[in-house]
């Protein structure tokens, strides 16, 4: 395998997926709508990644280029490529689906019958399966059976904290990432040969890993942010080093962890060690990760399949403790940020219809449920 088209040349794209692909000697073409970024990447054809942890190192990623994702160039690349990956954010998948569909149709028309694998690397459950549904809406029905045969839509779970670049840095392409990374793919969904990429782990039980990451890293991260905001902390590190927040975030992750242990049979001691590792990652002194970055888009994060309500539904299913998860949801409702449209919309909803109706709308929980009543009580105490 030689070539990949990666949608999304942002920090995750460059600092995580693009880097792993390039390290595996894959030639990566980034596709993005940010014209200055595309120009710089296509001109320099390399960038630096600062990996920070107990030891810091700077790696140079080479053999990369970039095209505008709204251009014909990206479609021509899809015709010939071996792999398509994305790190664009869940909301943008629907936008790029048409481009991918056009590329697949043109690929078939050009007589390229080699398998093509597509992996969406997003913070969403079964994101690639969602993308497939959107791509097929734009793909002529006569091509669906051929696409079923030749195009693998491979779901994945991804985990690496990549904060925005520091404003003081004069290299706009440099990106800072933590040393930890996890990219797990569903080996059952590939077509043809599975690419050999160091750092890409294969599993036949992806949902266990998707939910482990969602219920632990994502749940803990956003509760750290929302509790941190309430106490005036600016960064995730400041918030998690506050003893009361640390204790509550750990408790919330243990509550969601109980669901994982019951659902997937995870070993309790190993899962507790995973929780401790994540708490350590939040406290990484080399990562400046602002609570507003982690807390933004609260409406999406309160969705029934997302990081707060999905583990809560699991605790209801198994009859296990959930008081700290409920507090995390109450804290999410308290989140204010004038620059985030979802935060503004949420605050307007709370003013207009109150806590219970807002919760029912965003979470799908019944307005008269015990959980919604408890969240309202906690909200009024915060």
Curated annotation (Swiss-Prot):
Enzymatic reactions: D-mannitol 1-phosphate + NAD(+) = beta-D-fructose 6-phosphate + NADH + H(+)
SUPFAM superfamilies hit by this protein: 6-phosphogluconate dehydrogenase C-terminal domain-like (SSF48179), NAD(P)-binding Rossmann-fold domains (SSF51735)
Keyword Secreted listed: no
InterPro entries for the chain: 6-PGluconate_DH-like_C_sf, 6PGD_dom2, Mannitol_1_phos_5_DH, Mannitol_DH, Mannitol_DH_C, Mannitol_DH_CS, Mannitol_DH_N, NAD(P)-bd_dom_sf
Superkingdom classification of source: Bacteria
A single MF term (Gene Ontology): mannitol-1-phosphate 5-dehydrogenase activity
Keyword NAD among record annotations: yes
Keywords of this entry: NAD, Oxidoreductase
Broad EC category: oxidoreductase
An example Gene Ontology biological process: mannitol catabolic process
Recorded family membership: Belongs to the mannitol dehydrogenase family.
The protein, known as: Mannitol-1-phosphate 5-dehydrogenase
């Amino acid at each position: 395998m030689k070539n990949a088209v990666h949608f999304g040349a942002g920090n995750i794209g460059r600092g995580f997926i693009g880097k792993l692909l390039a390290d595996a000697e894959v030639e990566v073409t980034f596709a993005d709508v940010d014209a200055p970024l595309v120009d710089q990447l296509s001109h320099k054809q390399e960038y630096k990644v600062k990996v920070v942890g107990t030891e810091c190192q700077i790696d140079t990623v080479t053999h990369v280029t970039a095209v505008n994702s709204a251009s014909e160039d990206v479609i021509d690349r899809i015709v010939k490529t071996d792999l398509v990956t994305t790190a664009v954010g869940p909301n943008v998948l629907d936008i790029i689906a048409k481009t991918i569909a056009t590329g697949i149709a043109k690929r078939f028309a050009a007589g390229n019958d080699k398998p093509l694998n597509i992996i969406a690397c997003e913070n969403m459950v079964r994101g690639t399966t969602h993308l497939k549904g959107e791509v097929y809406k734009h793909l002529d029905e006569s091509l669906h059976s051929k696409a079923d045969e030749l195009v693998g839509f491979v779901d994945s779970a991804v985990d690496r904290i990549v904060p925005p670049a520091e404003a003081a840095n004069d290299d706009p392409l440099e990106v800072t990432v933590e040393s930890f990374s996890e990219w797990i793919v569903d080996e059952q969904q590939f077509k043809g040969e599975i690419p050999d990429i160091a750092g890409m782990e294969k599993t036949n039980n992806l949902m266990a890993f998707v939910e482990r990451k969602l219920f632990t890293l994502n749940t803990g991260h956003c509760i750290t942010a929302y509790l941190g905001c309430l106490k005036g902390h600016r960064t995730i590190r400041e918030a998690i080093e506050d003893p009361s927040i640390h204790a509550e975030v750990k408790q919330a992750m243990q509550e969601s962890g109980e669901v994982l242990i019951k659902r997937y049979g995870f070993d309790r001691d190993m899962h507790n060690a995973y929780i401790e590792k994540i708490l350590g990652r939040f406290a990484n002194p080399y990562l400046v990760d602002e609570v507003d970055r982690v807390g933004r888009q609260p409406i999406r994060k309160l969705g029934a399949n997302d990081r707060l309500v999905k583990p809560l539904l699991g605790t209801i299913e198994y009859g296990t403790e959930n008081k700290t998860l409920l507090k995390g949801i109450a804290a999410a409702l308290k989140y204010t940020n004038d620059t985030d449209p979802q935060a503004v919309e949420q605050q307007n909803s709370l003013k207009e219809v109150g806590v219970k109706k807002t919760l029912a709308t965003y979470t799908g929980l019944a307005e008269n449920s015990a959980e919604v009543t408890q969240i309202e009580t906690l909200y009024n105490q915060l």
